[in-house]
Amino acid sequence: MRRREPGRDVKRAAEEEFIELERRTDTYEDAVLNEDPQMKGFRFPSILSFPVPNKTIETGVTDENPFSARKSAFFTNRLIGREESDSSSSREDSPLGSTETGESCSTTDDEESKEKRIEYRDSQTQRCLGFCFRQLFFSRMWVFILQFIASYYAGDRFRTDGFNLVDKLIEPGQSVFGDVVVRRGLMGLRRWDAQQFLFIAEHHYIFEHSLAFFAGFPETVNYVRVGVNNGMESVFGWTFPPWVTITLAAVFVNLFCFLLCGMTLYQVVLIMTRSVKISLLAVSIFAFNPASIFFSSAYSESMFFTMTLTGFVFMLFGLRGKGFWHRMLKGFTGTICFGLTFAVRSNGLLNFLYVAWIWCGTLLWDEEMPIPDCHKLISTLAATKNERYKQEWQAKFWRFQQKRKQNRKVFRWTDPNFSRCVTLFIVIVCAISATLLFFTPYVFMTNFTADEFCKPQDSHKQAVETIAKTVRLSPKTVSVKNAWEKTTWCKKPKLFGIIARYYGEIQTKYWSVKFFGYWKIKKIPCFLMMLPAAILTVLAIKSSWNDVFLNKRWNNIWVLTARSDHSLPMAIHSSVLLFVAIFYINSEVFTRIIFSSSPFIYIYIATYIDKLTQGTIAGNRLWQYFESPGILPFFVFRRVWQDGWRGKLLYIYILGYFVFGTMAHSAWLPFT
C-alpha cells in the first residue's frame, strides 16, 4: 500500500507543534546569546527583573566523566618513545585506550563500559586527592622547619609587649618532652594571638581582653586536651603538664583541619569551575599560601576555613540536587556549617551572604517538567517523500532533541506550574529556619563566654589569684575578680534579650577598632604589608565582575543565584572584607583573613596560571601532577615567570610571604 504524502494542514500542525515545543526549551542563556553584543555589561534596571525566558541550564555538579582526554588536552596520557603533540589524534591514539580514558569505543552505553568509566573516574579522583595530600603535607613540613629555625635563632630577641602570659607561666623542667618538643621545637607556633588562644584553652575566659577571641577553636583544643589527659592517666597513670598537651592538641587540630580543608577546597573549586586542572592548582596554591603560618599556629584560621568550605560543599550540592527534600537536607546542613564559622571567628557573620544567596537559588528554582516529544513531526517525516523537506526538518529535529535532553531549571515565581502562595510559604519558613540555624551557635557562644566572665566560678577566681602570684599583672587588668566594678557591658541588658553585647566594646578598648581608628602614620608599614593581598583581591573582583557581566552577560540576579559556575557572591564578600580592612580593623590581618575566608583568591590565581600553561607547556598534563613528589609547590612554572612583571611579582609574593612571613611570625616580628 502506497504511503500518502501528508497534506499542508498536517505539515502545518506538525510544524506548529514543533515550534511550540522548541520555544519551551529556550533558556535565559539562549536569549543572552541572541541579544545585541552592545548590550553587555552591568545594567541596573534588568539586574532585578524576573528572567525571560524563566529557565536556565542546569549544568550539574561535575561531568559524568571529568577525566576524558577527548574533552581536554590536559588528560592526554604520557607518550613514551616519541614527542607529544597537542593534536586531537594524539589524544585519541593514547596507549591507555578507551577504558582508561573513560570513553567507550562503542556508541552504546552498556553496563560494562559504564562500570569501567566509573571505576576509572574513581581511581583518577583518588590520585588527584593523593596529589593534594602530598602538597598539603609537605607544605606543613616546610612550615614546621622554618618556624623552628626562626624561633630557635631569634629566641626572645624580638619579643614585644604583646600578650605572652602562656610562656611566662611555663615552669621549665616539668617535662623533658615538653621542654624539647614544645618549648623548643614548636615555639614558633605559639606567637602573637596564639598566646591568647592557648591561654583560653587552659584557663578559660578569666581576663576581659580574651573575650575578643571566639570560643570555637580554644574550646575544641581544650576538649582534645582533656581527652588526651584522661586517656593517658587511665592507661599510663600519668600525663603531661597542661601547657604541653594544649600546644600539641592545637597543632594536631590545625594539622587535621588543614589537610581536610585542602581536600574540600579541591571539591569546591571543581564544582565551581568544572576544571580538574584549576582545582589541583588551587590546592597547591593554598598549601603554600602567603598566610600559611596561621594555618599551623594556634590560630583559628584552619578551623574557620574548613567549616566554610564544608558549608560550600553541602549547599552547592543542595543547589544542584534532585528532589525537594534532598535539597532541603543539604541546604540546612550547609547552613549549620556556615553558622559554626560565626562561633569561630567574627568575620563568620559575612558568611550569611552565602547562606542567603544559595538558599535563593535553591528555593526559587526547581526542576523543569519533562518536555514531550514532537510526535506529529515524527509521523510527518516518516510519511513524507519530499527529501528536501525531510532533510531540513530532520536537522531541526536533531537540534531540538539535543536541547530537550538538557537539564533545565524553571523560576518558580513566574512559572504557571508552581503556586506563588506555596512558593512564598516555603521561602518564609526556610528563611526563618536558616536564620535561626545560622545564628544559634553564635548566640550560644556569646552567652556562654559572657556568663563565664561576668558570673565566674570560684575556680576561675582562684586561677586569677594563682597567676597573680606567679606573674605581676598590670593594675589595669580586668579579670573575673573585678568584672562588675571595671566593666559596663556586664550590666547591660542583652540584645533582643538573648545576645550578650561585649565584642565591639572590647575591640575598641584594647585594639582601637573603629572607623579610621587605624589610620596613623606609624601604621603605614602595616598597610604596606596588606597591599599585595589587597591588589590581588581587587584584580580578582574585577575579573569576576567582567566574567559575569561582560563575557557571560548574565545580567540577572535570579539567574546568578541558580548557577554555581561563577564567583560573584565571593567577589561581593571579598569587597566587604577589603573595605573593613582598610577603614575599620587592623589592616595587617587582611592577608590571613582573605586567604582563609573563601576560595575566591585561589580560584583567581589558579585560573591565571591555567591560561598561561596551555598546549604542551609543563603543567598542562595530569600525569605531571601525579608524578610530582609534592615536596615543592607544583604551581611554579617557567611560563608564568616569563609572563613579565605580573608572573614574577606573583611568585615573589606567594613564596616570599610563605618563607619570610613564616619566619618573621615565629621570631615575634610583626607578621600577624
Swiss-Prot record:
<comment type="pathway">
    <text>Glycolipid biosynthesis; glycosylphosphatidylinositol-anchor biosynthesis.</text>
</comment>
<feature type="transmembrane region" description="Helical">
    <location>
        <begin position="299"/>
        <end position="319"/>
    </location>
</feature>
<feature type="transmembrane region" description="Helical">
    <location>
        <begin position="424"/>
        <end position="444"/>
    </location>
</feature>
<feature type="topological domain" description="Cytoplasmic">
    <location>
        <begin position="261"/>
        <end position="277"/>
    </location>
</feature>
<dbReference type="InterPro" id="IPR007315">
    <property type="entry name" value="PIG-V/Gpi18"/>
</dbReference>
<feature type="transmembrane region" description="Helical">
    <location>
        <begin position="649"/>
        <end position="669"/>
    </location>
</feature>
<keyword id="KW-0337">GPI-anchor biosynthesis</keyword>
<dbReference type="GO" id="GO:0000009">
    <property type="term" value="F:alpha-1,6-mannosyltransferase activity"/>
</dbReference>
<keyword id="KW-0808">Transferase</keyword>
<feature type="topological domain" description="Extracellular">
    <location>
        <begin position="320"/>
        <end position="345"/>
    </location>
</feature>
<dbReference type="GO" id="GO:0006506">
    <property type="term" value="P:GPI anchor biosynthetic process"/>
</dbReference>
<feature type="topological domain" description="Extracellular">
    <location>
        <begin position="670"/>
        <end position="672"/>
    </location>
</feature>
<keyword id="KW-0328">Glycosyltransferase</keyword>
<feature type="topological domain" description="Cytoplasmic">
    <location>
        <begin position="367"/>
        <end position="423"/>
    </location>
</feature>
<protein>
    <recommendedName>
        <fullName>GPI mannosyltransferase pigv-1</fullName>
        <ecNumber>2.4.1.-</ecNumber>
    </recommendedName>
</protein>
<keyword id="KW-0256">Endoplasmic reticulum</keyword>
<feature type="compositionally biased region" description="Low complexity">
    <location>
        <begin position="97"/>
        <end position="107"/>
    </location>
</feature>
<keyword id="KW-0812">Transmembrane</keyword>
<feature type="topological domain" description="Cytoplasmic">
    <location>
        <begin position="1"/>
        <end position="134"/>
    </location>
</feature>
<feature type="transmembrane region" description="Helical">
    <location>
        <begin position="521"/>
        <end position="541"/>
    </location>
</feature>
<dbReference type="GO" id="GO:0005789">
    <property type="term" value="C:endoplasmic reticulum membrane"/>
</dbReference>
<feature type="topological domain" description="Extracellular">
    <location>
        <begin position="445"/>
        <end position="520"/>
    </location>
</feature>
<dbReference type="GO" id="GO:0031501">
    <property type="term" value="C:mannosyltransferase complex"/>
</dbReference>
<keyword id="KW-1133">Transmembrane helix</keyword>
<feature type="transmembrane region" description="Helical">
    <location>
        <begin position="135"/>
        <end position="155"/>
    </location>
</feature>
<feature type="compositionally biased region" description="Basic and acidic residues">
    <location>
        <begin position="82"/>
        <end position="94"/>
    </location>
</feature>
<feature type="transmembrane region" description="Helical">
    <location>
        <begin position="278"/>
        <end position="298"/>
    </location>
</feature>
<feature type="transmembrane region" description="Helical">
    <location>
        <begin position="240"/>
        <end position="260"/>
    </location>
</feature>
<feature type="transmembrane region" description="Helical">
    <location>
        <begin position="346"/>
        <end position="366"/>
    </location>
</feature>
<keyword id="KW-0472">Membrane</keyword>
<feature type="region of interest" description="Disordered">
    <location>
        <begin position="82"/>
        <end position="115"/>
    </location>
</feature>
<feature type="transmembrane region" description="Helical">
    <location>
        <begin position="570"/>
        <end position="590"/>
    </location>
</feature>
<dbReference type="Pfam" id="PF04188">
    <property type="entry name" value="Mannosyl_trans2"/>
</dbReference>
<feature type="transmembrane region" description="Helical">
    <location>
        <begin position="593"/>
        <end position="613"/>
    </location>
</feature>
<dbReference type="GO" id="GO:0004376">
    <property type="term" value="F:glycolipid mannosyltransferase activity"/>
</dbReference>
<feature type="topological domain" description="Cytoplasmic">
    <location>
        <begin position="542"/>
        <end position="569"/>
    </location>
</feature>
<feature type="topological domain" description="Extracellular">
    <location>
        <begin position="591"/>
        <end position="592"/>
    </location>
</feature>
<feature type="topological domain" description="Extracellular">
    <location>
        <begin position="156"/>
        <end position="239"/>
    </location>
</feature>
<comment type="function">
    <text>Alpha-1,6-mannosyltransferase involved in glycosylphosphatidylinositol-anchor biosynthesis. Transfers the second mannose to the glycosylphosphatidylinositol during GPI precursor assembly. Required for maintenance of epithelial integrity during embryogenesis.</text>
</comment>
<feature type="topological domain" description="Cytoplasmic">
    <location>
        <begin position="614"/>
        <end position="648"/>
    </location>
</feature>
<dbReference type="GO" id="GO:0000030">
    <property type="term" value="F:mannosyltransferase activity"/>
</dbReference>
<comment type="similarity">
    <text>Belongs to the PIGV family.</text>
</comment>
